[in-house]
């Protein structure tokens, strides 16, 4: 197995880029359909619409909007539907049959069904079709069945609904025809903090639900992504307040810190509260207690045109950043942190709720927060390139461009070491390790992700006898000699493999 120890030092002053394929991003948020709490890799807008619904949730559409924008630029999204207390809609015909939506949520409420009977070869056969919003289009979801078949099987699962036999159903029962009957009783689970009376309970439920989702995302070998966000939901007033009353004392920000610092290969995007002035951001988000190289905060919220909704809506700044990423990553170099008037631009920004000028922008950057600013020549763009690391000794230690490039190198080196740990010829593996490391880092150097590197293996006689490779990789992001140091211990002896 590969045992990895990492020590990082960086005091450099130059931004970094890397010319690689678009990174995978992880998004968490409500949708109108699909499995709740199941991380799902999505590769196209059509696939997203098929799995999570083509329409947006009424209260928190931000994650779905960001996902579709990123997918439209040939990116890959690891999407997890968030639904607290979501239930599936259904419809019953007496005690004979129940039709239930396969997934919880608004989509279930909008399902309509039609049931018609016909005599086929002397047997009464029923045909059920499903539609959405009472439209005539049938979503390839129709089924012919007999009552004896349903009685024998107990249930019949279709693409969008499941038929279940009722207690009174017999093979001689007669089902009344149904025409465009809507399913009822579904709850989409995305209306958080609906009243002051239930806010604390709703918050605890959100924290508990999020814990379950983030636990699934802890292992980078199972789910790979470079950026994770839960757009807009971190921006609800009092979400991080009253920490002592929250489940296990954890806030949303705390959980993202725990996840990203455990994985050490991704950055979490955090939104401020909608009403926050720039002086209040640190207090509102409890940022005075959070110093992490794996969080990036953006400000302020903005109004955006959303063609699918045929309206303008208020959007969290993390979506602005992801929108800029979708375009910039596809055209330029994806590991360059999106900032500046040429790359940090959003395609549909109308205005920001607070107009950020040069002085406010400088103040926000001094707090390691990335502002959305306006310039008459360039329009709205991100004027910051920071992770939230206010404890850093130097400004550049917190540059998001360096963080992303190093995260990528770290992830690829880790994969390489795991592969090498299963090679059984120790001397052969030593040369192969250095060869593969050089090939990886030469590519990053050519793509301007790093300025230089050095890789070497401890040639201890004892290590060689035990089949252990101690690999040290030093990466220099800039012409300065300060470095990121990666220490890997690879155990690849036959005895270790057979233990």
Regions found by a protein language model. Give the residues of each.
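Small/polar, repeat-rich beta-turn/loop motifs that tile beta-strand-dominated architectures
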Residues: 2-4, 9, 13, 25-29, ...
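Structured, hydrophobic secondary-structure cores that serve as assembly/anchoring elements
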Residues: 1-92, 97-100, 215-499
């Amino acid at each position: 197995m590969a045992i990895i120890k990492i020590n990082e030092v960086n005091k450099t002053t130059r931004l970094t880029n890397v010319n690689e394929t678009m990174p995978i991003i992880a998004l968490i948020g409500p949708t109108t359909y699909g499995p709740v709490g199941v991380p799902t890799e999505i590769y196209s807008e059509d696939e997203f619409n098929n799995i999570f619904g083509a329409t947006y949730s009424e209260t928190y559409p931000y994650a779905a909007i960001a996902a579709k924008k990123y997918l439209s630029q040939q990116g890959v999204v690891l999407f997890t539907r968030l639904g607290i207390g979501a239930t599936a809609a259904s419809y019953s015909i007496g005690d004979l049959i129940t039709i239930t939506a396969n997934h919880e949520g608004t989509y279930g409420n909008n399902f309509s069904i039609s049931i018609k009977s016909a005599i086929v070869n002397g047997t009464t056969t029923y045909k059920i079709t499903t539609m959405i919003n009472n439209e005539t289009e049938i979503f390839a979801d129709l089924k012919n069945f007999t009552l004896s078949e349903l009685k024998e099987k107990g249930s019949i699962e279709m693409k969008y609904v499941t038929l279940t036999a009722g207690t009174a159903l017999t093979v001689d029962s007669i089902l009344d025809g149904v025409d465009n009957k809507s399913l009822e009783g579904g709850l989409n689970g995305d209306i958080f903090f609906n009243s002051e009376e239930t806010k604390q309970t709703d918050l605890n439920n959100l924290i508990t639900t999020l814990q379950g989702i983030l636990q699934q995302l802890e292992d980078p070998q199972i789910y790979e992504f470079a950026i994770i966000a839960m757009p807009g939901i971190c921006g609800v007033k009092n979400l991080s307040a009253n920490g002592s009353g929250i489940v296990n004392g954890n806030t949303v920000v705390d959980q993202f810190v725990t996840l990203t610092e455990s994985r050490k290969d991704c950055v979490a995007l955090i939104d401020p509260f909608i009403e926050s002035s720039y002086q209040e951001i640190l207090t509102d988000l409890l940022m005075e207690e959070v110093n992490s190289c794996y969080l990036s905060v953006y400000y302020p919220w903005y109004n955006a045109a959303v063609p699918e909704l045929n309206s303008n809506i208020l959007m969290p700044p993390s979506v602005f950043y992801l929108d800029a990423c979708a375009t910039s990553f596809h055209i330029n170099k994806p590991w360059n942190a999106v900032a500046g008037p040429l790359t940090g631009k959003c395609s549909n920004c109308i205005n920001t709720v607070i107009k950020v000028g040069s002085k406010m922008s400088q103040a926000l950057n001094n707090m390691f927060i990335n502002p959305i600013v306006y310039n008459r020549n360039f329009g709205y763009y991100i004027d910051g390139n920071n992770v939230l690391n206010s404890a850093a000794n130097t400004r550049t230690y917190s540059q998001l461009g360096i963080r992303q490039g190093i995260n990528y190198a770290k992830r690829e080196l880790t994969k390489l070491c795991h592969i090498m740990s299963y090679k059984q010829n120790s001397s052969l593996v030593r040369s192969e390790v250095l060869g593969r490391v050089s090939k990886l880092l030469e590519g990053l150097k050519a793509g301007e992700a790093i300025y230089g590197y050095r890789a070497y293996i401890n040639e201890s006689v004892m290590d060689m006898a035990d089949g252990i490779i101690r690999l040290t990789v030093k990466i220099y992001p800039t012409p300065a000699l300060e470095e990121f140091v990666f220490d890997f211990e690879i155990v690849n002896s036959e005895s270790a493999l057979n233990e």
